[in-house]
Regions:
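Non-ligating segments of multi-cofactor redox enzymes
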Residues: 1-144
Length: 144
């Protein structure tokens, strides 16, 4: 998840785009599997799906959002979308919720009182490949 995602620019069919809230998503029905986005992503965040769906469509939860409740067909690209079906309902992404050590954090960086804003203010924070200008939304920190 980048503020200026190179993957969006290279998709020839606009199957990947940035939502108004900044989340980069993929529509698996539009994706033609050209893998241009995989080549453009400097973080290796894109994955090509070599397998057929493991879960039949009828087993999917009908209460989830359109972009997050789709069987990922063989031959399309996939990526993390911060579990937008969860975050838009006020929940944490699944990886944050189940992290056994609590080391994953998620929140509104624009809210100065949020946990993530406090971490950025008080910890030694860095982002990967900052020099590329993609402005990734993943921050890494450690205590000093």
């Amino acid at each position: 998840q980048c503020r200026t995602p190179p993957c969006v620019k290279v998709c020839p069919v606009e199957a990947t785009w940035q939502e108004k809230d900044g989340i980069v998503v993929v529509d698996y029905n539009w994706c033609i599997g050209c893998r241009y986005c995989e080549a453009a992503c400097p973080y290796w965040a894109r994955r090509f799906n070599f397998k057929k769906p493991g879960l039949p469509s009828e087993d999917l939860n009908p209460d989830m959002g359109y972009l997050s409740n789709r069987p990922r067909e063989n031959g399309v690209m996939e990526k993390c979308h911060f579990c937008l079906h969860r975050t838009r309902a006020g929940r944490y992404p699944a990886c944050v919720e189940v992290c056994p050590t609590g080391s994953r954090k998620f929140g509104n960086i624009l809210d100065p009182d949020s946990e993530i804003s406090n971490i950025i203010r008080t910890k030694r924070v860095y982002v990967l490949k900052e020099e590329l200008g993609t402005s990734p939304k993943f921050y890494y920190y450690f205590n000093v």
